[in-house]
A protein has these predicted regions:
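N-terminal acidic leader/helix
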Residues: 1-21
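A short, exposed loop/beta-hairpin motif centered on an aromatic-Gly-Thr core
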Residues: 15-28, 50
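Short, mixed-charge low-complexity intrinsically disordered segments
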Residues: 8, 17-18, 35-53
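Short amphipathic alpha-helices within nucleic acid-binding modules
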Residues: 28-34
């Protein structure tokens, strides 16, 4: 299982702002979700996929 954490660029680096709702079975599913988010997102967010144990 994977989760997608969302960060925003800050003057001191990256600031954690939250997590995309849901858990994903595969890394590829998580990547697709990120690509869909980027289509409508107007802010400069950065996404990180993390495996949940």
């Amino acid at each position: 299982m994977y989760v997608v954490k969302v960060y925003e660029e800050d003057s001191g680096g990256y600031l954690y702002v939250g997590q995309i709702k849901g858990k994903f079975l595969t890394y590829e599913d998580a990547k697709i979700k990120i690509e869909n988010q980027n289509h409508w997102c107007k802010h400069k967010f950065y996404f990180r996929i993390e495996e949940v144990i």
